[in-house]
Amino acid sequence: HGKGLEFGLWFEPEMVNPDSDLFRTHPDWVLKPTEGRLPMQGRTQQVVDLTNPDAYDYIYDAMDKLVGELGIDYIKWDHNKLVTEAVSPRTGRPAVHQQTLAVYRIFTDLKAAHPGLEIESCSSGGGRVDLGILEVADRIWGSDCVDPVERADIQRYTSLLVPPEMIGEHVGASPAHSTHRATTQELRMAMAFFGHMGIEWNLLKEPQEEIDALAEWVAEFKK
């Protein structure tokens, strides 16, 4: 903040690792088909049952405290594991729809408690991107692939439902980490202009002329 910047922090609030104190203390806070069986893990994770009021309050209170104490301006809400075999142990009923509504409510409650807070629904492959989330989020993340050639199609079809200014579109390094395709900075920057531009690129490794060119593009985007 002292340098005129805003502070963002990356969260993955719906996920819990079975090898964690939270899971060991509250195994009933996880969506699962039966009492004795968990869904298949994804990235060593299971899904917290936000339809359970106690679990909801725990997640909300933890995030609310961090936003207030750290002065967080921007939240990236990640969501990597697919919500499968999602039954709430509390009710014994399918919970995908209610889980989604609970996520909307956390977004709404956090933004009401912290005016000016922005939240990105950052989920690779669109796991937390739908028309409902557009009412409560400030930005969505279309894909972890930032190769501008691939992004042309991603942006094209995502923008059929999502306004371009809400679609995160980043300038990455060349070659791209996801496709290993080498592209010019001009192409990468031009593609980023079709969405909500950002940068995910280790500029400490780049020559000054690349950084200067990037600064010119950024200044143009801000006009």
Task: Please tell me what each predicted stretch does.
Residues 223:
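Carbohydrate-binding surface patches
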Residues 2-4:
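Glycine-centered short loops/turns at secondary-structure junctions
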Residues 16, 21-186, 194-201, 205-211:
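Active-site neighborhood of glycoside hydrolase catalytic domains
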Residues 214:
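Anionic-ligand-binding alpha/beta catalytic cores of soluble enzymes and soluble regulatory domains
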